[in-house]
Amino acid sequence: MMNHKELVLFAVVCLSLYQAVEPSQDVVKDMSLNFRKGLDACKKELNLPDTINSDFNRFWNDDHVVTNRDTGCAIMCLSSKLELVSDTGLHHGNTLEYAKQHGADDTVAQQIVDLLHSCAQAVPDLEDPCLKVLEWAKCFKAEIHKLNWAPSAEVMAAEMLAEV
């Protein structure tokens, strides 16, 4: 049985963990919503079908597996437009700033960059750049879910409807 001090300490730890996850979910949500703003321009530029909208709308759903090559092409286009990647790969400085612009503190922003960097290193060296970026995105999604930072489907749907 816990004594009063142990119970208070346990409550403080639980609250601090909750508060660390909630803002991180907000950061990922805000980054995602801003990231997709250029989607129509990328679809037009690359002549991509509207079917990729479903992948973007459901991206953070744990049960949704993204397999469409065109979605990888769109992610690559959006990342380039936001200057998050260059010809040599992830642009760490710009990605760090992008996370901070969407509410991340230094620690969360660095963790996001580290996750993206780790995923870039972990994906197989595929010849097709769209498929490579798709694998990179799937890795990042899985890592964000492990941290419990993925925004809920309900929150994302409500935010997207609010933007329309």
From Swiss-Prot:
Keywords: Disulfide bond, Pheromone response, Pheromone-binding, Signal, Transport. The keyword Nucleus does not apply. One of its GO terms (biological process) is response to pheromone. SMART domains: PhBP. InterPro entries: Odorant/phero-bd_Lep, PBP/GOBP, PBP_GOBP_sf. Pfam families: PBP_GOBP. Gene3D superfamilies: Pheromone/general odorant binding protein domain. Disulfide bonds join C42-C77, C73-C130, C119-C139. Monomer and disulfide-linked dimers. Belongs to the PBP/GOBP family. This is Pheromone-binding protein 2. It comes from Epiphyas postvittana. The gene is PBP.
